[in-house]
UniProtKB/Swiss-Prot annotation:
<keyword id="KW-0662">Pyridine nucleotide biosynthesis</keyword>
<dbReference type="Pfam" id="PF01467">
    <property type="entry name" value="CTP_transf_like"/>
</dbReference>
<dbReference type="GO" id="GO:0004515">
    <property type="term" value="F:nicotinate-nucleotide adenylyltransferase activity"/>
</dbReference>
<comment type="similarity">
    <text>Belongs to the NadD family.</text>
</comment>
<dbReference type="InterPro" id="IPR004821">
    <property type="entry name" value="Cyt_trans-like"/>
</dbReference>
<dbReference type="InterPro" id="IPR005248">
    <property type="entry name" value="NadD/NMNAT"/>
</dbReference>
<protein>
    <recommendedName>
        <fullName>Probable nicotinate-nucleotide adenylyltransferase</fullName>
        <ecNumber>2.7.7.18</ecNumber>
    </recommendedName>
</protein>
<keyword id="KW-0547">Nucleotide-binding</keyword>
<comment type="function">
    <text>Catalyzes the reversible adenylation of nicotinate mononucleotide (NaMN) to nicotinic acid adenine dinucleotide (NaAD).</text>
</comment>
<keyword id="KW-0548">Nucleotidyltransferase</keyword>
<dbReference type="GO" id="GO:0009435">
    <property type="term" value="P:NAD biosynthetic process"/>
</dbReference>
<dbReference type="GO" id="GO:0000309">
    <property type="term" value="F:nicotinamide-nucleotide adenylyltransferase activity"/>
</dbReference>
<comment type="pathway">
    <text>Cofactor biosynthesis; NAD(+) biosynthesis; deamido-NAD(+) from nicotinate D-ribonucleotide: step 1/1.</text>
</comment>
<keyword id="KW-0520">NAD</keyword>
<dbReference type="InterPro" id="IPR014729">
    <property type="entry name" value="Rossmann-like_a/b/a_fold"/>
</dbReference>
<keyword id="KW-0067">ATP-binding</keyword>
<dbReference type="GO" id="GO:0005524">
    <property type="term" value="F:ATP binding"/>
</dbReference>
Length: 215
C-alpha cells in the first residue's frame, strides 16, 4: 500500500477556515492520507489574477497552518513564472514522492470542467483525484464525464493506496458555504467583524496590518 499525499491547489486569496476544515476532515475520513500540501497558484489558468500578491498569500497560508503538522505549504507554483497548470506541477512533484500516491483534491464544480484543463488526458497518469462535494452543486450529465468515470472511478478508498495513480474517488464532507469572493467583498468595505468568524485570527491580523483587499 502506498501512503497518500494530498495536493490542495487554489489561489487561497485569502485562505479561510473552510479550506482548513476541508483538509482536516479529509485527513480524518481517509486514514492513509497523513499529509496535505497547500499549493497556491501564481496565475490560475481559468481565473483572474489573485488580488493579494504571491508573497502575501504564502504568508497567510503559513500563519493559517502553523502548529498543524499534517498541513504543509508547498510554493512550487509560486516559484514558477508562467500559468500554474496542474500537469506541470505534477510532473515536478512525482519524482520527489516516488513512494507515495499523489492525490489531487478538487471540488465537484472544478471537476465538471476537468476536460478543459491543460493536458487533462494525462493528469491521471500522475495522480488520483479526490473530488469533494460543493454545497448546492450537482455534476452535470455529460458523455465525456460518464466515460471518464466508467474508466477511473472507485468507491473504495483503499484503492487510492493500492495504486499510485489513475483513480477518481468522491468524498462527501460537511457543507461549508464559505466563499473567498464574499470575504474579499467585505474586506474591501472594511467589514472586519463580518469576516472574523470565517478567517483564522492570524490571517485577519495580517490582512489588517498590510491593508490587503481594501478598495
Amino acid at each position: 500500500m502506498f501512503p497518500l499525499l494530498g495536493l490542495f491547489g487554489g489561489t487561497f486569496d485569502p485562505i479561510h477556515k473552510g479550506h482548513l476544515a476541508l483538509a482536516n476532515e479529509l485527513i480524518q475520513k481517509l486514514p492513509s492520507l497523513t499529509e496535505i500540501q497547500f499549493i497556491p497558484s501564481r496565475q490560475p489558468p481559468h481565473r483572474p489574477s489573485p488580488l493579494a500578491s504571491p508573497a502575501d498569500r504564502l504568508e497567510m497560508i503559513k500563519r493559517a497552518i502553523a502548529n498543524q503538522p499534517n498541513l504543509i505549504l508547498n510554493d512550487v507554483e509560486i516559484k514558477g513564472n508562467d500559468i500554474s497548470y496542474t500537469i506541470n506541477t505534477l510532473k515536478i512533484l512525482r519524482p520527489l514522492f516516488l513512494t507515495h500516491a499523489l492525490c489531487f483534491i478538487l471540488s465537484t464544480d472544478a471537476f465538471a470542467d476537468f476536460k478543459h484543463w491543460h493536458q487533462s488526458s494525462v493528469i491521471l497518469e500522475y495522480c488520483h483525484l479526490i473530488v469533494v462535494n460543493r454545497p448546492n452543486y450537482r455534476l452535470p450529465q455529460q458523455p465525456w464525464l460518464s466515460d471518464l468515470l466508467s474508466h477511473h472511478q472507485t468507491e473504495n478508498a483503499e484503492d487510492l493506496g493500492r495504486f499510485q495513480f489513475g483513480k477518481i474517488f468522491f468524498q462527501t464532507l460537511s457543507p461549508r458555504p464559505i466563499s473567498a469572493t464574499q470575504i474579499r467583498h467585505y474586506l474591501a468595505k472594511g467589514d472586519y467583524e463580518i469576516v472574523a468568524p470565517l478567517l483564522p485570527k492570524t490571517v485577519l491580523t495580517y490582512i489588517k496590518a498590510h491593508k490587503l483587499y481594501q478598495q
